[in-house]
Amino acid sequence: MGCLFYCFQYQGNEILKKWGAHVERTKKTSIGTELLVNALRDQGAEIIFGYPGGAALHIYDEFFRQNVNHVLARHEQGAGHMADGYARVAGRVGVAVTTSGPGATNIVTAVATAQMDSVPLVVISGQVTTSGIGKDAFQETDVVSLMTPITKYAYQVEDAKDIPRIIKEAFYLANSGRKGPVLVDVPKDIGVQEVALEDIDDSFDLPGYNMDHEVDLGAVAAIKEALLQAEKPLLLVGNGVVKSEAHQELRDFAHRYNIPVTHTLLGIGLLASDDPLNLGLAGMHGTYAANMALMETDCLLNIGSRFDDRVASNPDNFAPDAKIIHVDIDLAEIGKIMEPDIALLADAKTALGALLQGAIAGWSDKTDWLAHQAANQALHPTRVPEMTDAIRPQAVLDYLGKATDGQAYIVTDVGQHQMWAAQYYPYQFPGQNLTSGGLGTMGYGVPATIGAAFAADEKHPVVGIIGDGGFQMTNQELNIIQHYGIQPKFIILNNTVLGMVHQWQHAFYSDRYSHSEFGSSLPDFVKLSEALGVKAAKVTDPADMQAAVDEMLAYDGAYVLEVLIDKYERVTPMVPSGKANNEMEGLS
């Protein structure tokens, strides 16, 4: 054991000597890390989020040499979520860098979050030397095997001359088709390998990855015919429409034919909240109108949504009388949960463009169906409760919407506050609500808010809505804000419990609140935030809530506002897991 460690340590020191020495770079040669940084720049990377370590020092040395715009996270998970938040707002590939071993494993949750929500990321991990791989070297992890199930592809570079091609491929894969994360694992010796520039060829061919699907015009015609024959047509739209930037085509199509629309959590903002055709959120915490429409429709056109269990909790009794039409860019999603009557493999923008070509002959507005939707919206509207003794979180989100004219990027963590943000903020544009919709990652909120703030413009403030539980997971990332001049705002809705866990323990476990209450053990969030370099305040009186929100928004800098709410506040309505969408509880 000692000999193996000594031999590896000696070999590592020899490599370190090479790293530390100046490498003469002529116009005829380059080294792996220089090729890496140049390739990132060629692909349009403007900012990198990361955390250095032994196996990534060669990469970070090149960052120093080339003055790379890098944000030093306080944890690799934070770096991944920052890259995620940045990517969602910027509409480009986010880039994160880690070291090997624990650095790579720490970012796994962020990568899985991006994969579930189709966020384009390129994650670069340092790795031990190629001679040390498979020998349990210090900080070695088989990160390629670890990340293969949660990425679109996981590379390990075997020759430095391949780096330009691999980075080019990685960006293409991440940002095409169904978008998602890609891993590039770079061993230390590959980073310092010298390469003749004449040997580099960054061209690539991915014969098994063809995103140029021709639209099936027969399927388009069948969709139009099905809509024509329907008396109760309904559109269900999701993240696929957001990712393909097809919101205008969606709005044009819905309004041309006056078809009501419901959306998933990640489809928020595709229609403005006050659009009369927008029935609101579908599924577990969706609106009465949306869920009833899903159960009553006779023709459901799903574009860019997966029929996941938060929308279709009981697939056997979901849209039971409807002809099901599924449009998706990912063939694996079609028929996975709901077997469609008509399927169209296409991205949402292409599909909606084809559906807009030529009017549906003989179309007449479904006036009775539209009137029924208006009646359902009036029967159980999304009401903002009055505040008496305690601040109501619904009122906080409603007032925040008024104070920002519905123009803020809202970034949430996961839990009750996530649902209140979905229900009560008046969204106006797609991609405006950043949240961990698929994986449900607590701890996403703080770093994703920071990442989003690096990409947002002055017209769209960035506000993180965080629970006291999620804030405790990644609050350390607040410490970076003071170094970069960004101005994200954070609202902590503090109910002193794990709110959604608490709610489910009430509903399904006879009020047995097992290990879900923090009580007096919570830290002082104001002092904690200030210690991390961010101005903070706390509000407990309903009469002071609006002024506190106004002060937060007006402050010239980052700001944390802690809002104390009641621990028995519930998210309503709710479709219990496994129930049909019309079996809602807690209707107003």
Where are the language model's segments positioned?
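Short glycine/proline- and acidic residue-enriched helix-loop micro-motifs
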Residues: 150-153, 205-208, 374-389, 532
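Thiamine diphosphate
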Residues: 138-139, 335-337, 343-345, 349-355, ...
